[in-house]
Amino acid sequence: MSLLSDLINLDLSETTEKIIAEYIWIGGSGLDLRSKARTLPGPVTDPSQLPKWNYDGSSTGQAPGEDSEVIIYPQAIFKDPFRRGNNILVMCDAYTPAGEPIPTNKRHAAAKIFSHPDVVAEVPWYGIEQEYTLLQKDINWPLGWPVGGFPGPQGPYYCGAGADKAFGRDIVDSHYKACLYAGINISGINGEVMPGQWEFQVGPSVGISAGDEIWVARYILERITEVAGVVLSFDPKPIKGDWNGAGAHTNYSTKSMREDGGYEVILKAIEKLGKKHKEHIAAYGEGNERRLTGRHETADINTFLWGVANRGASIRVGRDTEKAGKGYFEDRRPSSNMDPYVVTSMIADTTILWKP
């Protein structure tokens, strides 16, 4: 293995200008991530310098076998924490050969919303809290849990330390540093309420970049768990019973909300979100009804409720925001398996563009 490690860590810059670009795209389920690599003649700093590419869509559930070619367009570049040097990760979105976005390409519609002059003027900021569960390979049971059994009840695990409370910290810290290296605006990590469950936060990120950064952070985490021999789950309720689910709480503010008098803007935005509750819930992730039960720090899926410092609400406003009279709010409804392009653009569309 030491020889393999030596070769994997070869510094290409000593012998060649060429770099490796890992093209990443979203697969047919809308949640699975795919990637493949290609050699480029030299360092690249902007997606516009990168060639488009294609893949076999019939093997990802995104095209029929008789017309299987799907074209991927490079959209965002990050440093590659695995190959390092000048090598890069490239977040792409997918199109037909005729240039139409394929159904699983949610980035295209999101980019239209984020490029609208009214949205651009408001400089929307997002901070996304991505929860996930680490599972033991082969048995799909949470890391640190006895096989076929259960650990002690929730309580000591949230932000806990110790071999009987924190399971998978090496994976979590590796991911944290890898994201910082890649240029992702990861702002923190913590152990979650259910043992084997963790969270990382990305943001504040502006507009479409929030979606790009969450997807690439997910990809990096998939790669790290692959090396560790652990399965990564974004299921919003991986274990039935008295255990917390997994969400992707989305913190949001606009320029108007961050300025003096912003609290009134926040209240108007929350009112609009309440009027479109059903539409948002429908787009906020698969299986969310198993998580949004009104228990375990959630609001009931059929009820829209907001409150200050209330973690049982659909929308939570922080005490600091209330006191300052400006700031941000947190949409607690999105599930861990949500598409960040959909959620972020929908919040902007409802709160900025929609005129009820």
UniProtKB/Swiss-Prot annotation:
PROSITE patterns: GLNA_1 (PS00180), GLNA_ATP (PS00181), GS_BETA_GRASP (PS51986), GS_CATALYTIC (PS51987). GO terms for molecular function: ATP binding; glutamine synthetase activity. InterPro entries: Gln_synt_N (IPR008147), Gln_synt_N_sf (IPR036651), Gln_synth/guanido_kin_cat_dom (IPR014746), Gln_synth_cat_dom (IPR008146), Gln_synth_gly_rich_site (IPR027303), Gln_synth_N_conserv_site (IPR027302), Glutamine_Synthetase (IPR050292). The keyword Ligase applies. Residues 106-356 form the GS catalytic domain. Homooctamer. Irreversibly inhibited by the herbicide L-phosphinothricin (PPT). This is Glutamine synthetase cytosolic isozyme. It comes from Medicago sativa.
